[in-house]
Design a protein with these regions (language model features):
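Hydrophobic alpha-helical transmembrane segments
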Residues: 1-95, 111-120, 125-159
Length: 159
């Protein structure tokens, strides 16, 4: 069942070109998460260029889910499993968007030398390279070690 939050008595207000105060917020949630916000509302394409002001709120949403997994999960499961589950929750919620950007960055600057055009071409390439793989492995190991070294409460607050 799809719910449309745009249902108004005036059909002209539901046109694709109309703008609501929440369009940029919705665009940020749709772009930065894999949660099905698009089922509730389809913001105009122009809203996607103005999502910067909503980055903190989307971060609170994804970070809050990870923090809740750490805090509440530690009450019912062994902590090492909870740490892995919290990381998986974030990866699933964001579609690994940040990890993809990190891998592109590391591949570009690791393999591109000093040639700006080569760096940009490598960063645009959809294939992952050695620097991207190594960087992601080290990043995830560092995240695991950091979260595992903290109490569940401190880890949840740190996220």
């Amino acid at each position: 069942m799809e719910i449309n939050i745009d249902q108004t008595k005036n059909p002209e207000q539901n046109s694709p070109n109309s703008s609501h105060w929440y369009d940029n917020l919705w665009a940020a949630f749709i772009f930065f998460t894999r949660l099905p916000f698009w089922r509730l509302h389809q913001p105009p394409k122009s809203s996607y260029s103005a999502v910067v002001e909503w980055w903190p709120l989307t971060g609170w949403l994804t970070g809050g889910a990870m923090a809740a997994t750490l805090y509440f999960g530690s009450m019912v499961m062994p902590y090492p499993i909870v740490v892995i589950a919290a990381i998986v929750v974030r990866l699933l919620m964001t579609g690994a968007l940040h990890e993809d950007g990190l891998a592109d960055f590391l591949d570009g600057f690791g393999g591109g030398g000093t040639d700006r055009q080569r760096i940009l071409a490598i960063m645009k390439d959809s294939h992952i390279g050695t620097y991207g793989v190594l960087g992601l492995i080290l990043y995830e190991l560092l995240l695991l070690a950091a979260l595992f070294s903290m109490s569940p409460e401190m880890a949840a607050l740190t996220i």
